[in-house]
Amino acid sequence: MHNHKRKYHAISNGSGVIVANKDIRNGQANGVGNIGTSTVYFNTAFVKATSAQYADLAEMYQGDESYMPGTVVEFGGTQEITITTTESSPRIAGIVSTNPSYLMNSGLTALNSVPVALTGRVPCQVLGPVCKGDRLVSSMIPGVAQAFDASTYQPGCIIGKSLEDWTNATVKSIEVAVGRV
């Protein structure tokens, strides 16, 4: 292992944690880096990641309200996005993310700003029955998806594909691949 020195000092506590006063050093495999101290810290770190714990790419949007993760949202309302209320809405924005791997427009901190998954895997509220691989669209239930019905198709209405089966005619949170149509 090499500790590449730069102009600042880093100390290892022996457990793979690197405490850096102003710079990050190469640590041990799977190590955790604490940047700064309780009075000096960083707001942004530019890093190269080869893997991520979470599985979606999201973007911050200002909503009409603060929506729960798994809620299907569309462009419209008084702000940028609002909850879906119609079947097969062609204004789909995505699904409110639980904890995105990558977050665009992260500087948006306005009231009711939420991360909306644009692609990847996220939990989504769905009305069954839904089969694995089904294309999903918005339902009449606010913020809830359902299996695609070709008779109600409108361009732009597909949210993604179901990664799970749900056979009951009730609402449940399941994993969905967003943006895969």
Regions found by a protein language model. Name each.
Residues 43-181:
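Extracellular receptor-binding modules and their adjoining Ser/Thr/Gly/Asp/Asn-rich linkers
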Residues 1-65:
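Intrinsic low-complexity, repeat-rich intrinsically disordered segments enriched
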